[in-house]
Amino acid sequence: MRSILITVLILITILVCPVYGEEEYIDSNIVITDLYSDMDSGDVTISSQNDYQELILEIKLSKDGNILQTKNIDIDQIRAGSAVMKAFSWDVVATEDGGYTASASIYDNDHKLASRNYNFVHGRPAISSIKIDSVSSDSAGMSIMISPHPGVPAIIDLNFMLVDGNDVIYTKSIENVPIHTATTTVHEEWDRILEANKDYEARVKIDIHSPIQRTVSYLKPFKATEKVVITDVFKDRRGSSITLEGESQVPFEGYVRFTVLEPWYDPERTVKIVEQESPLLLSGDDETIEAIWDEPLEAGTYRLIIEAVGNGGAVIDTKETIIEVEERRVQPTPPEDENDRSIPGFAGVYALIALMSVILIRSKKN
């Protein structure tokens, strides 16, 4: 009975926990230091002690010895003492529950330099101490919202990745994140400049340490776009100013358009249009943009439309407000006093006469 129980426990452990394959050291100067995969995607980390060029990374997905899919990824160059990461996605439609194997091999022409296997189980629910509530990504970064299961605190490691094609162009690891009583949101901002209108993938790999060691990953594609926000609007009869804040790793190369309408309720009655170029802005940058009207506005109520226009001409953000200009009050001129019409400098003449009198009196006494 005891041997049967031990056998059952071993089988449960095999089904729940991924089995990490052994490194095959064919060329000790280049190794696959890490390999991860599930039924959707995976990643490979390669470290090298020598310079290599034009290598092929071959990745296979198999079940019970039957190869389901093969991916080939070019490695144009890897420098001595460096590491590269490659990401991949599977598009296997029909999948059965059970164990699968992902294998990665590096080839220089037909010569295999290194290989590694990774075994995982698909379709079998595993015990987990966390719940992923939401995952989002955009041109600024990636966010993940994580909740603990009641009464089951956990410590996790997060590895964020920014993927361009098969190339992992940015990665950031955050270790020992506690998940205990409340929902935890973790946000990572990209530290790379992105190309406008290009497709990227955001990946996060989560290592859960308890109650059972396991790894899960989430993938969120996005299209890189410019994004800025208009804040701190000031306006009066002479002009307007705003603060423009960058919220994307795609450089904002546009301008700000100030449009004044009068009367304010008629969108066809444009009074003034001023366009001011903006400096390049990325996430976290801000700049003050000012517009001065060619002539001060007359008394009245105006609508002010402020638009941040991107490099392609699309309006990215808009703010509307009202400018109220009151009639300028003319200060009345005070009436002149009779004494003010006296001969200019007459008070000075009196002072001069008094001074001369004092001098004459002193002269006579002497």
Feature map (PLM): residue ranges:
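Short beta-strand and strand-turn-strand segments in soluble, beta-rich domains
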Residues: 62-73, 155, 162-174, 263-277
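Structural beta-strand segments of beta-rich domains
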Residues: 38-44, 138-144, 236-242
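Membrane-proximal extracellular "stem/stalk" segments
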Residues: 178-341
